[in-house]
């Protein structure tokens, strides 16, 4: 927890897309919280950059309004907001022309000895333009980093091209490919659980684990992202990045240290060990779904096609996959992955189910003995839960009950749980890449995803309908139940 209050050296953060949705909802509130925790030192500055024509004061009012809308109750402090907005500046720039770049250079010259970070909170179509403008206007110092948001391509070829483009301007050690899921406290606690406790690691293998489930479900629909989402789909949007990164943290071998390269080397080995899914088995191990009209958050909602202009699409809003890792530790242990929109609730969790005891010494009257589970909850309510079998209290003989040992971070620690972006934004300034994705990881993930996309196309695998507000199509239930297992659906 000490990292929350260790100040960082003064820096300049330039946010391209500084008036966009990500900046408004996530980046500005995250930076505000870090100031409130006392981590900023003077003369730290945050510089918004976009095509909109705004003055410094107009941008400060924009930021104040954004904080008022997106901070939780009690977090908006007038004095603190005024202090925060006083360090905000704005430059109107155009990625496609010379407009504003000399103004940005002049502003940055005032802090030429500080750490400098460029955050590309914009679409990947202009990553190249912005990178080249940064280079051409000589804005790169020895302490410069660049932060890149997903999507990193839509297939291996485009990801490689995008990485090449950015790599012509910035060295790999300067590039921070952000996946906000990796900034969640629970993901880092997974490392602590595995490698700081003698209890779990000896059991963390195919001899003791029956299967692993990773679920990332959303209750929302398109939310004004129809143009992007219908070209991407759930596999590209969620599995290629968030879910495969979570899988890596579950399955990786112990790194030699917490050094960024050591951790990412082990994650890369997992990605390269994923068993290929091709046209020969894609229909047996994957399910594509698309939500229909139903109910969500207590009210009726439209189906995907009704939300979509044109009303015709075979894009999946849900995907379930039975993945396998071909290595010594995980051979024979299925990893069931699923993600989707308009599901029964917003939930991200990892469930490790251990194998059943080899022999029961108890009479049938004791009841069914359930397999032990370790549940790692990322959202909502980050925490860790371990299920155990114990004797039911009372004199009525030996009756067994499955009970949870439940640790909620919010209840266990008397501090505010920092948002993922708060941690990651300052890790960029600290030059700590442990929770960021390396180029070869991105490309290895696409090397596994691409054949699935091609297999769907080759086999003509269609999306299966599911009612909004449910856990997905019935075929996804069959995917796991034919192996004698069930999804963990509790929220």
Curated annotation (Swiss-Prot):
Keywords: Carbohydrate metabolism, Glucose metabolism, NADP, Oxidoreductase. NADP(+) binds at residues 51, 150. GO terms for cellular component: cytosol. Substrate binds at residues 180, 184, 218, 237, 341. InterPro entries: G6P_DH, G6P_DH_AS, G6P_DH_C, G6P_DH_NAD-bd, NAD(P)-bd_dom_sf. The active site is at 242 (proton acceptor). Signal peptide: none annotated. One of its GO terms (biological process) is glucose metabolic process. Its EC number is 1.1.1.49. One of its GO terms (molecular function) is NADP binding. It catalyses: D-glucose 6-phosphate + NADP(+) = 6-phospho-D-glucono-1,5-lactone + NADPH + H(+). Gene3D superfamilies: Dihydrodipicolinate Reductase, domain 2, NAD(P)-binding Rossmann-like Domain. The keyword NADP applies. Pathway: Carbohydrate degradation; pentose phosphate pathway; D-ribulose 5-phosphate from D-glucose 6-phosphate (oxidative stage): step 1/3. SUPFAM superfamilies: Glyceraldehyde-3-phosphate dehydrogenase-like, C-terminal domain (SSF55347), NAD(P)-binding Rossmann-fold domains (SSF51735). Catalyzes the oxidation of glucose 6-phosphate to 6-phosphogluconolactone. Belongs to the glucose-6-phosphate dehydrogenase family. NCBIfam families: PRK12853.1-3, zwf. HAMAP family: G6PD. This is Glucose-6-phosphate 1-dehydrogenase. It comes from Rhizobium meliloti (strain 1021).
């Amino acid at each position: 927890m000490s990292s929350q209050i260790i100040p960082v050296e003064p820096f300049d953060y330039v946010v391209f897309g500084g008036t966009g949705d990500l900046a408004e909802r996530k980046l500005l509130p995250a930076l505000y919280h870090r100031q409130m925790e006392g981590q900023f030192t003077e003369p730290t500055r945050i510089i918004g950059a976009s095509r909109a024509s705004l003055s410094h004061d107009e941008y400060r009012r924009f930021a104040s309004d954004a904080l008022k809308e997106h901070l939780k109750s009690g977090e908006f402090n007038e004095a603190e907001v005024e202090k925060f907005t006083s360090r905000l500046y704005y430059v109107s720039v155009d990625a496609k022309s010379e407009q504003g770049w000399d103004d940005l250079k002049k502003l940055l010259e005032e802090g030429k000895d500080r750490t400098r970070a460029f955050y590309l909170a914009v679409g990947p179509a202009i990553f190249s333009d912005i990178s080249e403008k940064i280079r051409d206007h000589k804005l790169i110092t020895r302490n410069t980093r660049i932060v890149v948001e997903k999507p990193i391509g839509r297939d291996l070829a485009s990801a490689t091209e995008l990485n090449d483009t950015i790599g012509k301007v910035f060295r790999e050690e300067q590039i921070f490919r952000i996946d906000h899921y990796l900034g969640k406290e629970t993901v880092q606690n997974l490392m602590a659980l595995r490698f700081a406790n003698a209890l779990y690691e000896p059991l963390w293998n195919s001899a003791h684990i029956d299967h692993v489930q990773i679920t990332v479900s959303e209750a929302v629909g398109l939310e004004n992202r129809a143009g992007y989402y219908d070209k991407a789909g759930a596999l590209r949007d969620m599995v290629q990045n968030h879910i495969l990164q979570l899988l890596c943290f579950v399955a990786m071998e112990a790194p030699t240290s917490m050094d960024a390269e050591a951790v990412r080397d082990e994650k890369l080995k997992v990605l390269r060990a994923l068993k290929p899914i091709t046209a020969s088995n894609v229909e047996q191990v994957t399910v594509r779904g698309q939500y229909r009209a139903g109910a969500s958050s207590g009210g009726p909602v439209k189906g995907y096609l009704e939300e979509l202009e044109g009303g015709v699409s075979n894009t999946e809003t849900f995907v379930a996959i039975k993945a396998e890792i071909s290595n010594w530790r995980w051979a024979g242990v299925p990893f069931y992955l699923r993600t989707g929109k308009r599901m029964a609730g917003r939930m991200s969790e990892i469930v490790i189910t251990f194998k059943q005891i080899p022999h029961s010494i108890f009479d049938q009257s004791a009841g069914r003995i359930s397999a032990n589970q370790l549940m790692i909850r990322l959202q909502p309510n980050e925490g860790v839960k371990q299920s155990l079998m114990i004797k039911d209290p009372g004199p009525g003989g030996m009756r067994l009950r499955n009970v949870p040992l439940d640790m909620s971070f919010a209840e266990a620690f008397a501090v505010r749980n920092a948002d993922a972006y708060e941690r990651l934004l300052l890790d960029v300034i600290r030059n700590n890449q442990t929770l960021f994705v390396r180029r070869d990881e991105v490309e290895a993930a696409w090397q596994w995803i691409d054949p699935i996309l091609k297999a769907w196309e080759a086999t003509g695998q269609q999306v299966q309908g599911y009612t909004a507000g449910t856990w997905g199509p019935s075929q996804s239930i069959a995917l796991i139940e034919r192996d004698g297992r069930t999804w963990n659906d509790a929220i």
